[in-house]
Amino acid sequence: MNIKDCYNFEDFRKLAKKKLPSPIFHYIDGGADDEVTLNRNTNAFNDCDLVPNILASVGEPDLSTTVFGRKIDMPLFLSPTAMQSLYTPEGDKASARAAEKFGTMYSMSTMASFSIEEIANISSGPKLFQLYVHKDQSITDDLIDRCRRANFDGLCLTVDTLVAGNRERDHRTGFTTPPKLTLESLLSFAMRPEWVFKYLTNKKFELANIKHKTDKGTNIAKSVIDYINEQYDPKMNWKDAEYCIKRWNGPFALKGVMSVEDAKRAIDIGCTAIMISNHGGRQLDGSRSPFDQVKAISDAVGDKLEIILDGGIRRGSHVLKALAAGATACSFGKAFLFSLGAGGQKGVERLLDNMQKEIRRNMILMGCKKIEDLDASKIIYRN
């Protein structure tokens, strides 16, 4: 099986599982606690049906939309995800180049494997930076200022990771950053010699954006949970978010909004967008899925800011359902990380090509000429 044989999410997942050591595969694949929310994120789309209109003379549909002040060629972009060099040596560079090739947005994590400046130098495409509020205020300020100098288009502040979720798979596999060989993980790494060779012969693992501020999580092997609990500020509040918005002074989203009340308050403090997200089911297990919440939030604030649905996207039809329910665009992480692990930049390009074709095909079948044609009349909920 190779990249050319990958036609859907499960194909990329299977190929990534064959190529990645078990701790790294399960870091992508897993969620919090019993993984109820992880599974619900995708299953929620099954409770909604698309309603097509026939004989609409669609021709070639326009898939473009605008987010964070930039036009993107399809209403789907890459979510910010950490430590991408664990999946392929090129890491974020591969993702950014693939996103630019398909005219969509690349999103960078604070915990990226390459720096803000390195990505700005290799990509002129739309770029979003994901910010965390650190206990050390100078780290937060430095990240915001560097993004401005590097001409990133927008910032999103992640607000659902005050403490790390209970990711039991990581406990069982002994996942650390950088990877550390233990009795539990030794066999899984030994079974992936190609990955081990690439890891040992390429750029040393580091959290490139913050390496000059702290060595925690860079040259010291520790769990992601430990890093989050040590570095991120669990006392973050609305004033902290407003401070970041004012310091950035540009397109800004809160990532992790799940209630109408919080969406309204995001407007009050100056957000231009929100990302409806539960961190891919990796934080609070038992919480609602983004798709379950998007209609209520859109009905309340959809005319005042951009709404990004983040989580559970596996198919082009999921994107159409989210847009019809009121989202401006969607983002996905797990799917593209599997494609990155399965085939590097070419893997991500294959995934984006698949998704673009699915969205286009389904737009034609729905009788929709442009994204704005996808409204509440195009879906019916089963319950």
Placement of each model-derived feature along the sequence:
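Short, basic, glycine/proline-bearing loop/turn elements
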Residues: 77-83, 126-132, 225-227
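Alpha/beta catalytic cores of nucleotide-metabolism and tRNA/nucleoside-modifying enzymes
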Residues: 1-46, 289-309, 313-383
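A gly/proline- and charged-residue-enriched helix-loop-helix capping module
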Residues: 100-122, 126-140
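An N-cap/entry alpha-helix motif that binds or orients negatively charged groups
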Residues: 1-69, 178-236, 372-374, 380
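Short, conserved beta-strand segments within well-ordered enzyme catalytic domains
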Residues: 49, 64-66, 75-79, 105-109, ...
